[in-house]
């Protein structure tokens, strides 16, 4: 029965590891990292590659508009430029004109007020009330006018004073379309007249430059 209490121990094979195969990790230096890659630290020098020609980023702008007829006051690449320039210029001009109007109005209304603070407050109220009103109104008119004018020029394939006057008439009528026929007719006439004057002034200015 001794075999119940004894076990045959199987000897497991042991493998000997050569100490030369063990590699102890060492800290890598900056030179080791740079030497093992394609990175050239000499290129970071401020005076590196001065003997080589410079590389320029060439960005070709879109061609200017070639529609025949009256040219724009400034070089234009199409209806996008006309829309942006016209709307922005009109808004800033209206803001300045409205600001002067409000300044004059505020000074007249507060001329009898002795308190400097109250008078300044009244003047600022007049400027902030009239300035944005005129600026927003002229900006909207210029936005619609340039859009309609560009559409007419695209359909006719040429610029001309007829385009400007027609665009001005349609813009004025559309701007006062909720006020009745009389208000639409008055607004249409005023904006068409302003567009005609602007076209004549632009033509004379362009002729002087040429």
Swiss-Prot record:
Molecular-function GO terms, alphabetical: protein transmembrane transporter activity
GO cellular component annotations of the record: mitochondrion; TIM23 mitochondrial import inner membrane translocase complex
Ranges that cross the membrane: 87-103, 133-153, 183-201
Domain of life from the UniProt record: Eukaryota
Region (Disordered): 1-24
Compositionally biased spans, kind Basic and acidic residues: 7-19
InterPro entries, per the entry: Tim23, Tim23-like
The protein's role, per its UniProt record: Essential component of the TIM23 complex, a complex that mediates the translocation of transit peptide-containing proteins across the mitochondrial inner membrane.
Subunit structure: Component of the TIM23 complex, at least composed of tim23, tim17, tim50 and tim21. The complex interacts with the tim44 component of the PAM complex.
Entry-linked PANTHER family: SD19278P, TIM23
Full protein name: Mitochondrial import inner membrane translocase subunit tim23
């Amino acid at each position: 029965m001794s075999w119940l209490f004894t076990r045959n121990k199987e000897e497991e094979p042991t493998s000997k590891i050569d100490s030369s195969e063990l590699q102890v990790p060492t800290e890598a230096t900056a030179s080791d990292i740079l030497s093992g890659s394609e990175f050239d630290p000499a290129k970071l020098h401020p005076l590196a590659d001065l003997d080589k020609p410079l590389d320029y980023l060439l960005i070709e702008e879109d061609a200017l508009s070639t529609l025949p007829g009256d040219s724009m006051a400034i070089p234009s690449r199409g209806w996008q430029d006309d829309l942006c320039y016209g709307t922005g210029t009109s808004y800033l001009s209206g803001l300045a004109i409205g600001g002067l109007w409000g300044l004059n109005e505020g000074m007249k209304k507060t001329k009898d007020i002795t308190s400097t603070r109250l008078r300044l407050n009244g003047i600022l109220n007049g400027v902030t009330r009239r300035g944005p009103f005129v600026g927003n109104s002229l900006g909207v008119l210029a936005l619609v006018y340039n859009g309609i004018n560009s559409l007419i020029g695209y359909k006719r394939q040429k610029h001309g004073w007829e385009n400007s006057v027609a665009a001005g008439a349609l813009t004025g009528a559309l701007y006062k379309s909720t006020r009745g026929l009389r208000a639409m007719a008055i607004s249409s006439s005023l904006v068409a007249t302003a567009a005609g004057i602007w076209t004549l002034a632009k033509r004379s200015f362009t002729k002087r430059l040429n």
